[in-house]
Amino acid sequence: MEELNFDVVVVGGGPAGSSAAHMAAKNGCTVALIEKEKEIAETVRTSGVTWISDIKKFGIPEECYNPIKKFSFCSPKNSVKISGEIAKAAVLDVRKTYRFLANRAKTSGSELFTSTNVTEVLKD
């Protein structure tokens, strides 16, 4: 088996792992980003609405989200409606967003390993 050496090994190609890999590579580290699925976001278990200002802070491109001008938050005892002329929130295309983040990590220099399970951590 070929021996590979990296400064940083990130386990999990979700948004946190991909973002960590991106920042580490951007700052000069050699990085392995390890994902157990065959491809990033093969199995997505989340969705939702978030603020556009927060999306932009993470550099997520517009093609990864759908702006909305009206929405409601509902609970068993209360609801709040929010609307306006300018969209302040958006529904993320989670699969597209995760893949964008992983690709950004690769572009920064991280090496992506898919279909790879981490079963043990060995410290040198």
Feature names for model-found ranges:
Residues 37-62:
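Conserved N-terminal glycine-rich FAD pyrophosphate-binding loop of Rossmann-like flavoproteins
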Residues 73-124:
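Conserved N-terminal helical subregion
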Residues 65-70:
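A short, compositionally biased
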Residues 17-18:
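N-terminal Rossmann-fold NAD(P) dinucleotide-binding loop
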Residues 9, 13, 22-45:
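Glycine-rich FAD pyrophosphate-binding loop
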Residues 3-8:
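Extreme N-terminal starter segment of soluble prokaryotic enzymes
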